[in-house]
Amino acid sequence: MSRPEHIAPPEIFYDDVESKKYSSNSRIIEIQTKMAERAYELLAIPETAEGLMLLDIGCGSGISGDVITDAGHYWIGCDISQHMLDVAIDREVEGDVMLRDIGQGFPFRAGSFDAAISISAIQWLCNAEKSHHNPRKRLHTFFQSLFNVLTRGGKAILQFYPENSAQIEMITASALRCGFSGGLLIDFPNSSKAKKYFLVLFTGNNNIMPSAKGVEGEEYEQQEEEDSNEVKYSNRKRDRRRVTKSKGSAQHKTKEWIMNKKDRQRKQGREIKNDSKFSGRKRGPKF
């Protein structure tokens, strides 16, 4: 399936039809909300803190902004798609929204925001949508402007979908050159579906990196990718137990084989039942 940034520029891709999915498609809303909640969690804002000002980069229809509102803070969101902002206005979000190309920086005074989050937006900066666009220059402008509008000691959590390792390196290096400290955090790194990339950036010295999820086989609730709306069907033939040609019975799996498979699936982030004394034990004859 083609990546959205390969189909059209964001202001064209997120047209009236695509934008309305973000207010009517429960699956998209659920995924966006969970990623925004994770981004806010990584900010590690003390529960005693109230009324902070946050910047929502690529705010879209305001789903991630709702998470900020629920946490008791104020926010300003910017997005390049007028249609997405129209949906946010129709939803009567609490924050203020503005039309803005983040590759041109932010029109705010220095130190205006205590923190910033972004969900599925900054990978668009790696594409040259116009002849005069230079991805490296646009990334530099973005990160330098973001560094300036954050307070000293502020933090930014940017979730994104990198196309390859070179893109990760280009984004991370650009952020560090602009004065940020921090790095890349990957939730569920062993799972192709649940893997999520977060760029964790600090403007001050309090730069302790948070812990990633799923590194030690932590269980998770499996979810589809944000931009995938396809219905998945199980392959019944593949799911059936393999039958040997000679005896016509299911091929026997040893206890060691079963335990190794369960351990591998846990590392991939799948929900696997806990081991018991019956795990891998041969069952008696059926009635």
UniProtKB/Swiss-Prot annotation:
Acidic residues bias: start-end ranges: 217-228
InterPro entries according to UniProt: Bud23-like (IPR039769), Bud23_C (IPR022238), Methyltransf_11 (IPR013216), SAM-dependent_MTases_sf (IPR029063)
Bias (Basic and acidic residues) ranges: 253-278
Keywords of the record: Cytoplasm, Methyltransferase, Nucleus, rRNA processing, S-adenosyl-L-methionine, Transferase
SUPFAM superfamilies (UniProt xref): S-adenosyl-L-methionine-dependent methyltransferases (SSF53335)
Known catalytic reactions: a guanosine in 18S rRNA + S-adenosyl-L-methionine = an N(7)-methylguanosine in 18S rRNA + S-adenosyl-L-homocysteine
EC number, as in UniProt: 2.1.1.-
Protein's cellular compartments: Nucleus; Nucleus, Nucleoplasm; Cytoplasm, Perinuclear region; Cytoplasm
GO CC annotations, alphabetized: nucleolus; nucleoplasm; perinuclear region of cytoplasm
Function: S-adenosyl-L-methionine-dependent methyltransferase that specifically methylates the N(7) position of a guanine in 18S rRNA. Important for biogenesis end export of the 40S ribosomal subunit independent on its methyltransferase activity.
Family membership: Belongs to the class I-like SAM-binding methyltransferase superfamily. BUD23/WBSCR22 family.
Protein name per its UniProtKB record: Probable 18S rRNA (guanine-N(7))-methyltransferase
Lineage summary: Eukaryota, Amoebozoa, Evosea, Eumycetozoa, Dictyostelia
